[in-house]
Amino acid sequence: VSTKPTTTDLEWTELDQRAVDTARVLAADAVQKVGNGHPGTAMSLAPAAYTLFQKVMRHDPADAEWVGRDRFVLSAGHSSLTLYTQLYLAGFGLELDDLKAFRTWGSKTPGHPEYGHTTGVETTTGPLGQGVANAVGMAMAARYERGLFDPEAAEGTSPFDHFVYCIAGDGCLQEGISAEASSMAGHQQLGNLILLWDDNHISIEGDTETAVSEDTVKRYEAYGWHVQRIAPKPDGDLDPHAIYNAIEAAKKVTDKPSFIAMRSIIAWPAPNAQNTEAAHGSALGDDEVAATKRVLGFDPEQSFEVTDEVIGHTRKALERGAEAKAEWEKSFQLWRDNNPERAAEFDRISKGELPTGWEEKLPVFEPGKGVATRAASGKVLQALGAVIPELWGGSADLAGSNNTTIDKTSSFLPADNPLPEANPYGRTIHFGIREHSMAAEMNGITLHGNTRVYGGTFLVFSDYMRNAVRLSALMHLPVTYVWTHDSIGLGEDGPTHQPIEHLASLRAIPGLNVVRPADANETAIAWREILKRWTKEFGKGAPHGLALTRQGVPTYEANEDAARGGYVMFEAEGGEPQVVLIATGSEVHVAVEAREQLQASGVPTRVVSMPSVEWFEEQDQGYRDSVLPPAVKARVAVEAGIGLTWHKYVGDAGRIVSLEHFGASADGKVLFREYGFTAENVAAVARESLAAAQR
């Protein structure tokens, strides 16, 4: 096989082409072996993925976590073999047996790429469009990171300068989340982001003419992106030279994200399956796989054929990666020498440590005063923001309501934005009314590393964010969601804005910790605990959702046990508790008032505040039993939402004061009264439970 380059701009040899074709047959074989999967896109995209991994990206397969690396996101996650074949060829740790085990129990090659499971996979993708927003978040994080550590460096000269590459398919760009994120990227002028669109005109139901007719390239131009179209080769295959040249041109446009439309033919060069919807999501069949191998010059009788010459050639990526990293290390060391204080800060942040004495900055709120927990959260953020520079975030256009602004004078916006507070390295992110992409961008920001991000909206709009929140949990990402206006207590905006099912629904997501503090002091402790729990170590981190009130609620003495998720806020007087009242958030003060009535009538009553069911469940059985004694069968849970969470805690004799229907437009106090969230009703329900327990 000739190794002589065929052009001067891109060194591309016959051996490179053989490696691309090897990736194609590996994709076809892997799907054929397991009997299911998505071969077509992996076959047609092989030249683009190979060009990125072997010719373009700065990365070191031996150190997939290298800070200076370029990032790659496969938004079209169903085409996971596009990524797996390149990870194998480049030497990231996958071997041929891993490709043979594609989509099987315990393999390193699951059906869709999973972060933390396979080395070299930067994010979990599969739900279409999520990866586009993840990539936008990574590009945002790269800019903020540069602002933390090297803001004065000339463009392209900082060790913190790198690119984010994303491959997206037709489906990704049909999803609304990609429109939200792409609009954000254009507005932010993210010149470090390059998106390659696999324009193959095929979806599951056939040609994309079934559902789409707009000019996608013009749409991206309207978003403010730099756009290019590249034509395929005369035979229909993707042209590596055109891809390489387009990427090089994109890199030079530093004030816009770049969109490269690649017209492709799905499953190329399969003689019968190419350009058909059948090639999208099912095995080609033995005959078609054999026919494809003949077209490409492979032995149709062999499966998973990789020559020593090919793997020897592609594994040179390890040498190039080591050289690139060594070169980067020089510039990084020079930066460290010239910036010792920033270098110390970088070391602290990259270890996930917080500044010495940060906890002392947390506000302590005076008991008795009525403070909305959203307002308390805002005070906490402003206090912590002063000492934790890596903490940044914003809101989906509800900053004044969510109380999510650390610094009103510093907005994360391009330098030429007309607003006076615009700063490319600003503290406050204006996500816009784009809740779904906000959540996925926060995932990308967190995956990128070296910052801590939060984002806010109303709790009811967490529905818009749900798939991205689920992926936060699936990836164990320490993202913080600030969800305010958390119940009917928000009042007159009515049932469209009043969360009812949301708390229970969010608690149903495995790995998401929902925290609903009772008052200002619990809110401060919640933020402290969330920050202490922050870790990027896979499997140990977790996203948190803070559910905060619009309305003022009484402030109680701070109790450190709030960090354990549930604790005895007020103990029974006059003997062992006969009844336990369990409440969260704004309903805790209702339970406290009900306790006073019960105590006055001679019923020793304990009040348990349970800001986080998930944190409480982490505690040992002894602690949980000390809070909720098994011997006390009379229990009442009080929460202004559906009661699904509480059945396991109240037991057979227990009762739940909940809301099993939508709310109404009226003052929040009126709604609490009309729907039974009063001390009188809770006390009456407690007596019912007591009677049931004594039967």
Predicted regions and their residues:
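Thiamine diphosphate
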Residues: S2-F163, T314-L318, A322-P543, A547, ...
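Short beta-strands and strand-loop turn motifs
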Residues: C166, L196-D199, V482-W483
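Residue-level marker for buried hydrophobic side chains located in beta-strands
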Residues: C166-I167, L195, G394, R516, ...
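Intrinsically disordered, low-complexity segments enriched in small/flexible residues
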Residues: D170, A279, F365-E366
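Short acidic, Gly/Ser-rich segments with clustered Asp/Glu that frequently serve as metal-coordination loops
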Residues: G171-I177
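Non-catalytic, alpha-helical, charged scaffold/linker segments
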Residues: K293-F298, S303-A324
